[in-house]
Amino acid sequence: MTLDPTKHPDWKIALDAESRMKTVETLAAELGLEKAELLPYGHYMGKVEQQAVMQRLKDRPNGKYIDVTAITPTPLGEGKSTTTIGLVQGLARRGRRSSAAIRQPSGGPTMGMKGSAAGGGLSQCIPLTPYSLNFTGDLHAVGAAHNLGMTALTSRMQHERNYDDATLEKLSGMARLNIDPTRINTGWVMDFCVQALRNIIIGIEGDGRRNDGFMMRSHFDITVASEVMCILSIARDLRDLRERMGRMVLAHDRNGKPVTTSDLGVAGAMTAWLVEAAKPNLIQTIEGQPVFVHTGPFANIALGQSSVIADRVALKLSDYHVTESGFAAEMGYEKFWNLKCHYSGLVPDAAVVVATVRALKNHGGAPQPKPGQALPEPYTREDVGLVEAGCANLLHHLGIVRRSGVPAVVCINKFHTDTKAEVDAIRRICEQAGARVALSEHWEKGGEGALELADAVTDACNEKNEFRPLYNWNSPLTERITTIAQEVYGADGVEFEPLAAQRLKDLQERPDADELGVCMVKTQYSLSDKPALKGVPKGWRLHVRDVLFFGGAGLVAPVSGDISLMPGTGSKPAFRNIDVDVETGKVTGLF
């Protein structure tokens, strides 16, 4: 008997569903994989040999490609993963061969503010605990590859300090790279949110010995912000992955020349850590539909997409494939539209914009809800006025999708506490704007509650598609950044601080400047670069304070506002609720 999500936490619902789930071999056979194309990880998870699948099905047409995005979220999240899974379950109930692609959750948010990213209620993916903790080891492999690169860099700096040119050549055949310790492009990574590691000193020599490393300032980023994760997300195949790994710029020499992983002789070994991680993972929804889980970059500080490889494989195996972009349309969908689709060559058939009464109330003027705390009073009573005022944010995000030329569906992700009047107000405003809108109760009712959404998406996929990029990649980097700020965020313009302006000037002078993508780094809690500005801010300019460069990924990342690549852990973290039943070995408290 299915548990009631209004009475039971997600982890209990998942445990109940896991007692009836298919083996991964059964799941793969239903998906159309041959036996040799599946690498089982236990009974219920597996990896897919993507190169074998793509070769076998190279002449098969792709299925319909749908992206799920959202309005500007609250810190509680508005249910994009839940909607992605619910939509796939709804499509399956309509007899359509469907699959989902979601990102692998990071340990930091899982143990911090968010808990698992497996969906929720009756629209989850399972098995929940392995998916949320460790999974098939991909995040560990990404971290190991990244930190191996840093090991090669810092050890090389130590040896060049300790030995003259002749000795370096004699000992290892190394030529001096003359690395500038003040121009190290990256730090180390780990998969937790540790604010204490944002700024550190490494290589402290203690008693003066010269074998304890090169003393310098350094830092840790969260693993999902690593360039290695981004490369894994956009690589089309293993060859593309290897080539990109060799172009990563870890530092500069004293003459300003980039020092790459190839210069350090470590690119091949870094790629070796990723051979298995490059294969998409396969699990299932609680109703038995296939879910591809592959890569996990955040959308505010990185690409925010599951992998190109997973989507390409799934589109050969499914009639409808639903992928998810991180955070809201101005962040995740913009990067899906102008970066992921550029790298993959794929064209979406439809996009879903998820909206909740809760987030609309926030944009209408209600105070920001906080994880782990009771909802403020405006969220616990009916307030149609707040919902109507907040719909300006929804219409802005709908406009972003329309600008891409892709047919859009607004999904009202209904919570069981929402009132009919509040839901009717959203529907009325969307319909007045000419939008296709669907109410979905997938959290509470699973696929049965997503039938209206499934039908709306099916209809949208049959509409005329005029997909087009936002900008020309041949245009200058500053022009592309300004286009994103004005056309997507709604800014009046862009202010480049001197450091950012100089770095953009240097990057624009590269011969491959028109091959570099623009991957914005900005808060996810506002259309602007100030998280407190809700709704649709007016009369503001985007301030770009720095520009990061990722040579392997081929991305330029303008940084706006006060945002860190290493998030912090708050005062009421999720890990306090997580434990293990020592009699059964089952993990409890994941949500």
Swiss-Prot record:
An annotated Gene Ontology molecular function: formate-tetrahydrofolate ligase activity
Catalytic activity: (6S)-5,6,7,8-tetrahydrofolate + formate + ATP = (6R)-10-formyltetrahydrofolate + ADP + phosphate
Keywords: ATP-binding, Ligase, Nucleotide-binding, One-carbon metabolism
Record-linked InterPro entries: Formate_THF_ligase (IPR000559), Formate_THF_ligase_CS (IPR020628), P-loop_NTPase (IPR027417)
Pathway, per record: One-carbon metabolism; tetrahydrofolate interconversion
Record carries keyword Ligase: yes
Residues annotated for ATP binding in this entry: T74, P75, L76, G77, E78, G79, K80, S81
UniProt keyword Aminoacyl-tRNA synthetase, yes or no: no
Biological process terms in GO annotation: tetrahydrofolate interconversion
Superkingdom of source: Bacteria
One Pfam family linked to the record: FTHFS
E.C. designation(s): 6.3.4.3
Family: Belongs to the formate--tetrahydrofolate ligase family.
HAMAP family xref list: FTHFS (MF_01543)
NCBIfam families from the UniProt entry: PRK13507.1
Protein name (record): Formate--tetrahydrofolate ligase
Organism: Desulfovibrio desulfuricans (strain ATCC 27774 / DSM 6949 / MB)
Gene name of the record: fhs
